C-alpha cells in the first residue's frame, strides 16, 4: 500500500474507531482497544460457572465461518455505514478505499486475467479489522433470547436453562438465528463444522439448520481447550507437554550457552506457554498446580545450572514468583482497571462494584461478593475469588494513581492469605482452611 494511502487509512481508522466505540456491543472483543481474547473467554466461562453453580444447565455453540474477512461484500458494508450515520464524504472515501482493487493468479509462469475484487477487506491493513467489526455489529441485535461471545470471526452463542432439553431447544433457535444472519449478510457459515459443548455428559445431538451436531466433551475456543466440567485439565496438560518439550531442547543446548542466553530462552519458550489467557484456567486443581510447579522448578534448574537449591531459592535467584502468584498479579491488574472504571464493560458484569459509597461518604466502593452454592463452580470462580483477592492487596497499592503505577507496585505483592483452594491447607474431616 502506498505511503499516502497509509496516512489516509490511519486518519479514517481514528475517526471511525471513536465514532463506533459507543455503538459496538460490549461482547465484541476483537480488534478493540482495551479488549482481548481473554476478556471474551472470562465472560463466557464465568457465566457458565455461575449457571452451573445455581443448578442450571448450560450450552454453547462454536460456529464456523469460511474466509470471513475475504467474503465481506463491499456494497452491504457501505450501506451499513450509511445506516449508522457516517456522512456521505466519508462514505465516498471508504468506498474508494475498498473498490478498484484487482487480483490475478499465477501458476508456474502463467498468469490469469486481472479480476475486480468485489468482496473482503484488505489483508494486513489497519482499517480492515475495524470495518469487519462494523459489518458484524448488527449481529448482536438478534440476541434477545441468548448471549454471545465474539472475537473477530469467532462467534459463540450460548444459552442456559432449567434442564438440558430446554437448553438444546434454545441453542437450536439461537443457532438458526445466527446462521440466518450469516446467510442474509452473504457470509459463508459452515453448519457441519460447528461444535457443541454442553454442561451434561449425555450423548445428545443439536440440530443446526440441516446438520445434526453431537455434543463434545471439550473443544478449543480462541486457543483455550474448554471442557464441559470446566476443570481445564486437557488444556493445562497440553501446555505442560509443550513446555516440557521446550525444556528438553533447552537442556540439550544449555552446556553450550551462557546463563544470560538461557534466561532469554526460558522467557521466550517456557514462560510464554503459560502467559496466554491465564485468568481463564488459573484456579484449577492442586494436582495440576503441582505439575506446573515441577516444570517451573525444572526450568529454573536448567537455566541456572543449579540442582541443589529449593524451588523457593530458585525463584529468589530468578527474582520471580510461581506461575500461580504471577497469575494472581495479572488478576489484580484487571481488578484495578474495573475498580477505577478503566476496564472493559464486559468485566463490569463479572466483577460488579457496590456503589453504596455514593450515598455514604464514610464508606469506600468495593467489589460485590456473591453467594455461592458449590465448591467446583462457585468457590472456584473468578467472580467469587476476585473480590476476596482484592481485599488482600495493601491499600497503598490499590490507591495507585494509574494503571502503570499499579503494575509497578503489584510486582512486590505476594498474598499472605490467598482464598483459593490451591493456597489453602486441607485438614481431614474439616476441609480447606
Over which residues does each language-model region extend?
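Short amphipathic alpha-helical interface segments
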Residues: 56-59, 190-194, 257-268
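Catalytic palm active-site di-aspartate
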Residues: 28, 58-68, 94, 120-128, ...
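Conserved pre-catalytic core of RNA-dependent polymerases
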Residues: 1-122, 159
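Short, conserved micro-motifs composed of acidic
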Residues: 173, 187-219
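Short linear motifs embedded in intrinsically disordered, charge-biased segments
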Residues: 287-433
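Short, conserved catalytic/metal-binding micro-motifs enriched in Asp/Glu and His
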Residues: 12, 64, 81, 94, ...
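Basic, alpha-helical interaction scaffolds
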Residues: 213-280
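Conserved, non-catalytic sequence blocks in retroelement Pol enzymes and Pol-derived host proteins
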Residues: 1-5, 29-38, 51-53, 66-70, ...
Amino acid at each position: 500500500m502506498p505511503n499516502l494511502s497509509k496516512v489516509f487509512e490511519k486518519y479514517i481508522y481514528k475517526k471511525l474507531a471513536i465514532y463506533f466505540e459507543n455503538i459496538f456491543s460490549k461482547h465484541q472483543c476483537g480488534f478493540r482497544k482495551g479488549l482481548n481474547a481473554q476478556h471474551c473467554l472470562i465472560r463466557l466461562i464465568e457465566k457458565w460457572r455461575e449457571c452451573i453453580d445455581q443448578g442450571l444447565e448450560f450450552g454453547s455453540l462454536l460456529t464456523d465461518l469460511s474466509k470471513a474477512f475475504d467474503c465481506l461484500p463491499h456494497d452491504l458494508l457501505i450501506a451499513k455505514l450509511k445506516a449508522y450515520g457516517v456522512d456521505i464524504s466519508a462514505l465516498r472515501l471508504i468506498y474508494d478505499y475498498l473498490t478498484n482493487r484487482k487480483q490475478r493468479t499465477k501458476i508456474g509462469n502463467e498468469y490469469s486475467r486481472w479480476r475486480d475484487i468485489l468482496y473482503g477487506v484488505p489483508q494486513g491493513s489497519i482499517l480492515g479489522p475495524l470495518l469487519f467489526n462494523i459489518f458484524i455489529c448488527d449481529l448482536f441485535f438478534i440476541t434477545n433470547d441468548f448471549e454471545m461471545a465474539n472475537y473477530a470471526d469467532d462467534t459463540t452463542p450460548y444459552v442456559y436453562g432449567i434442564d438440558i432439553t430446554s437448553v438444546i431447544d434454545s441453542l437450536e433457535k439461537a443457532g438458526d438465528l445466527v446462521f440466518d444472519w450469516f446467510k442474509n449478510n452473504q457470509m459463508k457459515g459452515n453448519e457441519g463444522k460447528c461444535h457443541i459443548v454442553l454442561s451434561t455428559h449425555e450423548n445428545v445431538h443439536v440440530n443446526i439448520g440441516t446438520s445434526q451436531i453431537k455434543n463434545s466433551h471439550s473443544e478449543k475456543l480462541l486457543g483455550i481447550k474448554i471442557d464441559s466440567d470446566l476443570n481445564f485439565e486437557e488444556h493445562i496438560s497440553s501446555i505442560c507437554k509443550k513446555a516440557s518439550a521446550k525444556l528438553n531442547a533447552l537442556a540439550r543446548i544449555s552446556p553450550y550457552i551462557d546463563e544470560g542466553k538461557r534466561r532469554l530462552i526460558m522467557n521466550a519458550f517456557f514462560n510464554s506457554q503459560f502467559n496466554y489467557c491465564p485468568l481463564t484456567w488459573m484456579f484449577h486443581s492442586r494436582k495440576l498446580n503441582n505439575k506446573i510447579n515441577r516444570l517451573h522448578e525444572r526450568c529454573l534448574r536448567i537455566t541456572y545450572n543449579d540442582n541443589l537449591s529449593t524451588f523457593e531459592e530458585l525463584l529468589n535467584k530468578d527474582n520471580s514468583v510461581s506461575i500461580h502468584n504471577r497469575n494472581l498479579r495479572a488478576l489484580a491488574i484487571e481488578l484495578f482497571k474495573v475498580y477505577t472504571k478503566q476496564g472493559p464493560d464486559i468485566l463490569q458484569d463479572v466483577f460488579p462494584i457496590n456503589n453504596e459509597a455514593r450515598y455514604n461518604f464514610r464508606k469506600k466502593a468495593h467489589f460485590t461478593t456473591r453467594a455461592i452454592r458449590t465448591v467446583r463452580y462457585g468457590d472456584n470462580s473468578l467472580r467469587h475469588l476476585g473480590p476476596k483477592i482484592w481485599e488482600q492487596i495493601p491499600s497503598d497499592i490499590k490507591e495507585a494513581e494509574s494503571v502503570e503505577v499499579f503494575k509497578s507496585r503489584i510486582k512486590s505483592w505476594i498474598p499472605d492469605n490467598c482464598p483459593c483452594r490451591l493456597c489453602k491447607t486441607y485438614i481431614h474431616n474439616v476441609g480447606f482452611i
